[in-house]
């Protein structure tokens, strides 16, 4: 498994350990992680603290995100895809899109290369979480 997807999975596990939704993300440039984050909607009571947004916040002001690659354990939603497009990130690796198809077509239509890794570990992590906490999941994707 890719070391950067492993790092994103580690972030997702941290989020779950904190009582949140197990989605993690890392931002990579020049072969090094420059930001990492996980979904903190539950922990922070903030509806927009998705994993990718937390990751970008933690990367901070890096000047230019071009050349950076975003890894996420789940296909980014429209909120996070908007940030990807806004900051000029041109490549996204998603752990899976079976649980949530996200905004793949939106990103691709804006010139972002999106690669779905079809990670069984990511799929199983989400299946288990959704079975245990359906109300949190449906709140997260706006389907309450």
Protein language model regions, located:
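Short, basic/aromatic recognition patches
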Residues: 1-18
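Secretory/periplasmic and organellar redox-cofactor proteins
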Residues: 9, 114, 124-144
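Short secondary-structure junction motifs
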Residues: 18-22, 65-67
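Short beta-strand scaffold segments in enzyme catalytic cores
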Residues: 23-31
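Zn2+-dependent cytidine deaminase-like catalytic core
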Residues: 35-127
